[in-house]
């Protein structure tokens, strides 16, 4: 393979260039994807039908190699590269401005790779996480340690120094690019930068892999989006460290932030692969939906990520960090789905979220939304369907799950919200006071005039809500919510175990667990749960038959309860809830499988 060096003044010409014709886009797509779980379900939820094939072997660049030295023109090299070429950027160098990825007629055997020229041996392995250590940064205040004993700067840095634009901009029609070993950021300042890697909602873009990148804003500046997926298909965000995405305004120029976001616009969207990343954002760490759309993103794989918000972003905390004006960043949740279908959330750690702005400190929101913009409801086709959440740990939150079908602020009706499977999840350190919310495990509800919530299963969950186990809402004139299953869980009930979301016409207004379940759900299954420390005024007769009522957490016989904060929630061999599930397994999460799934997630 022949290599070329581009001096600072060199312009790469198109002389002799040949284009690779794409005979069939369907064939090209098939070469980067596989039928992953086609026809497979987790409980009621269909699993993704297609996964992005993002291994290095699946994204070959067999063409020429070009090197852009420090001070060279990266854009010239990219503009003139042929499909299949590799462009090397100088390790440790800074390239200022915007890198635009232009449309080229590439195919699945001829990717354009843009990467640091540091050798592979100087980078994390192809399935290992990038951290700031590889940019010479040994630690970041308020973040988990990334075990950097020998920091080294082997990344090439792309830094945007303006306003209202982006460090990496993906053009309409761009396809078959892989970025490796880059730091992508902005300069500090009071100006808003709306995205670091940006794809417009109106642009048809496909086959992109963002691999082992450090994508970040600055500690105090408003930076809205890390990776904005726009109108894209077959995109992977892998092995990357994304941090300092935040906005300070409840209304105004920068109101919401995400590490990764998409799900709006009229173009086909998905599949997406978001795997083995550190994802930090004040708003939603991941968001799908929230704007005008006439199509739904499909086949979304979210695995092995660490969702995180530094507690230093909470006003009044030691070492508080806010915006350039001193105000706190707007905090919302870890994952919010307003428009998404066939989503797998598997083997993730989700830490730190709180209320105090427009939300109540829930970790996960499954809330289809026909969003209202300028008085118009702009997404009647928005749905959240077929979502699986499993083998994950949620900690330091005001609530676990908000699951609801509701009208938008302008009265917009979503298409559907249904078929959710949640199992083998630990939710601990739920604290409504500290994290400014309700202190509950889950809220389930259907608003007026919207499609009813149905087919929700919550099984083998270990959780310690201090206030309320379930909040339920549905007006009596609505049809009952269908097919609710709550089994094999180990959960503290709190003093208000199954409670009404409010209103005298709510099906849950009795606040008596058995009556609420009978009145709100048809049919329902609520059995073989360990309902820990249920209050004396809610005797066993006020619950469905077939459940267990340990008087306190000690009676459960956890290996180490530790106050419900970071404990070892294995059951001791003598626990009465060992092998007590409907399936012969222990009540609560399968801790062995969960720990194995989370191995290597940091």
Predicted features and spans:
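Extracellular beta-strand/beta-solenoid scaffold signature
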Residues: 109-112, 155-169, 190-201, 219-230, ...
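Right-handed parallel beta-helix/beta-spiral solenoid domain characteristic of secreted/periplasmic
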Residues: 70, 105-193, 212, 217-219
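Bacterial N-terminal signal peptides
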Residues: 22-33
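Right-handed parallel beta-helix
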Residues: 111, 175-186, 204-217, 233-248, ...
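Short, conserved loop/helix-junction motifs that constitute active-site signature segments
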Residues: 103-108, 518-520
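N-terminal secretory signal peptides that target proteins for export/translocation
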Residues: 1-16
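Acidic Gly/Asp/Thr-rich repetitive segments characteristic of extracellular carbohydrate-active
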Residues: 55-96, 100, 164-167, 575, ...
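Acidic, glycine- and Ser/Thr-rich low-complexity intrinsically disordered tracts
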Residues: 37-64, 128-153, 325, 330, ...
């Amino acid at each position: 393979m022949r290599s070329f060096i581009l001096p600072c003044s060199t312009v790469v010409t198109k002389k002799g260039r040949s284009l690779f014709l794409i005979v069939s886009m369907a064939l090209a797509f098939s070469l980067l994807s596989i039928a992953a779980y086609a026809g497979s379900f987790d409980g009621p939820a269909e699993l993704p039908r297609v996964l992005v094939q993002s291994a290095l072997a699946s994204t070959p660049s067999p063409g020429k190699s070009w090197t852009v030295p420090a001070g060279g023109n990266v854009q010239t090299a990219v503009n003139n590269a042929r499909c299949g070429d590799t462009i090397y950027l100088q390790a440790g160098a800074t390239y200022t401005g915007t890198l635009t990825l232009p449309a080229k007629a590439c195919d699945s055997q001829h990717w354009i790779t843009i990467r640091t020229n540091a050798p592979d041996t100087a980078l994390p392995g192809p399935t290992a996480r990038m951290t700031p250590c590889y940019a010479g940064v040994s630690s970041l205040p308020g973040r988990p340690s990334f075990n950097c004993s020998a920091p080294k700067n082997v990344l090439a840095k792309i830094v945007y120094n303006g306003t209202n634009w982006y460090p990496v901009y993906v053009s309409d029609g761009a396809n078959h690019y892989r970025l490796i070993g880059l730091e992508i950021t902005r300069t500090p300042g009071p100006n808003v930068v709306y995205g670091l890697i940006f794809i417009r909602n109106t642009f048809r873009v496909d086959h992109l892999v963002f691999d082992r990148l450090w994508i970040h804003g600055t500690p105090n500046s408003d930076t809205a989006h890390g990776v904005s997926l726009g109108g894209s298909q077959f995109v992977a965000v892998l092995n990357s460290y994304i941090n300092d995405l935040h906005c300070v305004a409840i209304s105004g120029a920068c109101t919401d932030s995400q590490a990764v976001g998409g799900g709006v616009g009229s173009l086909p969207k998905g599949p997406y692969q978001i795997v083995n990343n550190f994802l930090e954002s004040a708003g939603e760490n991941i968001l799908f939906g929230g704007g005008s759309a006439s199509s739904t993103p499909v086949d979304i794989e979210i695995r092995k990520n660490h969702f995180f918000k530094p507690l230093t972003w909470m006003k009044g905390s030691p070492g508080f960090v806010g915006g350039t004006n001193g105000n706190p960043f707007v905090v919302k949740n870890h994952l919010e789905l307003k428009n998404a279908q066939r989503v797998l959330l598997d083997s993730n750690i989700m830490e730190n979220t709180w209320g105090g702005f427009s939300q109540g400190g829930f970790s996960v929101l499954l809330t289809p939304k026909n969003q209202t913009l300028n008085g118009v409801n702009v997404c009647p086709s928005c749905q959240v369907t077929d979502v699986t959440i499993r083998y994950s740990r949620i900690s330091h939150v005001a609530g676990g799950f908000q699951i609801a079908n509701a009208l938008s602020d302008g009265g917009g009706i979503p298409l559907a919200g249904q078929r959710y499977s949640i199992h083998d999840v630990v939710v601990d350190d739920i604290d409504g006071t500290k994290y400014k919310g309700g202190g509950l495990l889950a809220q389930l509800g259907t608003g007026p005039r919207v499609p009813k919530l149905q087919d929700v299963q919550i099984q083998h969950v270990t959780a310690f809500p201090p206030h309320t186990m379930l909040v339920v809402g549905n007006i009596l004139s609505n049809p009952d919510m269908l097919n609710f299953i709550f089994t094999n869980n180990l959960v503290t009930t709190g003093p208000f175990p199954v409670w009404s979301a409010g209103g005298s016409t709510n099906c849950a207004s009795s606040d008596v667990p058995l009556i609420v379940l009978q009145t709100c759900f048809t049919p329902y299954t609520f059995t073989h749960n360990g309902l820990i420390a249920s209050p004396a005024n809610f005797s066993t007769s006020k619950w469905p038959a077939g459940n267990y009522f340990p008087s306190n957490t000690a009676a459960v016989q956890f290996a180490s309860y530790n106050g419900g904060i970071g404990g070892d929630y294995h059951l001791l061999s003598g626990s009465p809830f060992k092998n007590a599930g409907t399936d012969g397994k222990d009540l609560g999460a399968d801790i062995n499988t969960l720990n194995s799934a989370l191995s290597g997630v940091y």
